[in-house]
Amino acid sequence: MSNEKMENLLNLALDATEREREKSLDLDTGYDRAERTWEVIVKFGGTEEALRGLFAEKFPEEYDRIRITNLRNEYAILLLPEHIVELVAALTEIEYMEKPKLLFFAVNNGRRVSCINQLQTVGTEQGTLSSGRNLSGTGVIVAVIDSGIDYTHPDFRNADGTTRILNLWDQTIPADSVADPFPAENGETSFLGAPSGYFLGTEFTRAVIDRALEQTTERERFALCPSRDISGHGTHVTGIAAGNGRASQGRYRGVAYESPLLIVKLGTPGERSFPRTTELMQAVDYCIRKAQEYGMPIVINLSFGNNYGSHSGNSLLESYLDDMANYWRTSIVAGSGNEGASAVHASGTLRENITKDVEIAVSSYEPSLNLQIWKNYSDEIAVSLIHPNGTRVGPVRQILGPQRFRLGNTDILLYYGEPSPYSPYQEIYFDLLPVNEYIDSGVWTIQLVPQRIAAGNYDMWLPAGGVLNEGTGFLMPSEETTLTIPSTAARVITVGAYDGYFDRAAAFSGRGYTRETNQVKPDLVAPGVDITSCAPGGGYVTRSGTSMAAPFVTGGAALLMQWGDGDIIRLR
């Protein structure tokens, strides 16, 4: 199967066997084995009503199993029975379709080195700092889409003990599983559900959170609002962007300390896995809709990413975020990722008659590994894969559809991509899957033999370093174009990390240019080394990463929008 209106990874996932999908890091994402359904992202033409009518007409027997989550600007998340995915993609109204990708958090004296103090005057309640313009984020929403929040932490509460959180959408808590603390007029018990227009998780309003905070015991609080931040990542990020420092008498106060908060905990009910891009897109849509309801400008913080894609800014996720950054009074901030020193990117320029060997070290106990090669379609290259024991497959045929090989105790799944409306570059995708539990360790080699070269540039990416074992990576990596997606989006404010103690960029910080488009990224850097911020339980913890750098800029953007009365056009 090969459909040019579907991305390569989705084409391959539909062609892969169930065993191959289960063994792969990426191919299974978005597939529900029990229901035999796929979650996909689409860009379509027309209205939601027209799309629903089209599905009812074309797929009457399956219509009750089709779920549409409509996003702004003609994007949607669809849940489709497996056997109609390709048929839906072939519809004239569907412009392009992608599968979800996993997202990984970018974790590896912030306020002072960010020059925030000079913009604020602090009252005696939270200590005295040098006076400035007294910007605090008032009237500008800070939205954090992350691992959740400890809503009981003093830094996210007002002086009277009430919450600063306008709404909390926990995508991991099934709808209708939490009783509404405010009984219906007839006295019957009702249950909290997903936000209007969405099917995922449970939404908690400010009133519900305040009712939970009124309770005297932790058990009573979490019975009313059971949302927790297990990893502490989202709590830490929110504290940097907008914590008010009440638990530390102002010592660890965040940037936009009076901004109202919107919180989305990413995830899927019942799954213990990384969040997906489909959940992120719904979260962004939700936050902007809420900002419009409240009539306030909004800054959205994204402190995670992934490595799948051409890194050129043209995937549906990146295009969607670019569109949303121009919608309402919205700024979107993303960390550049922590792949700068993780050996997951290699690049070079091929010349005719000169063979290029790219070596990849694979450590022991690696359950699977995938590799993307991105090149110009006009370049003809013979590609071979060489096992650590010297056996090889290739040169592989440049044909559409999956190709399968076995080297040692490792199965190889290969897919050659073709042109598509959202991908003008060619992808060659290798998925190394274990015959038993682990793929073969040692040094693998990708051999590139130029046949006919027009441009010659190539880039290779492995998965984000956070999911690889230590020691797995390219032996000759490139530190450039190590941005994670979606920080490659053109209109997203991309933030790298620097070390404020030594006044230099952090080695782990992802960096550009973006591939082919050559856009300079990150747009700016912020403190990202040894940053102290909020931790679940009411205290503080120190962390490093571009996850910690991005919220400094998120808070700073809120101050700027407060100063400019939310006039995003003038501020740009």
What does each of the following model-derived ranges do?
Residues 27-30, 293, 297-306, 328-330, ...:
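C-terminal subdomain of the subtilisin-like protease fold in secreted/lumenal serine endopeptidases
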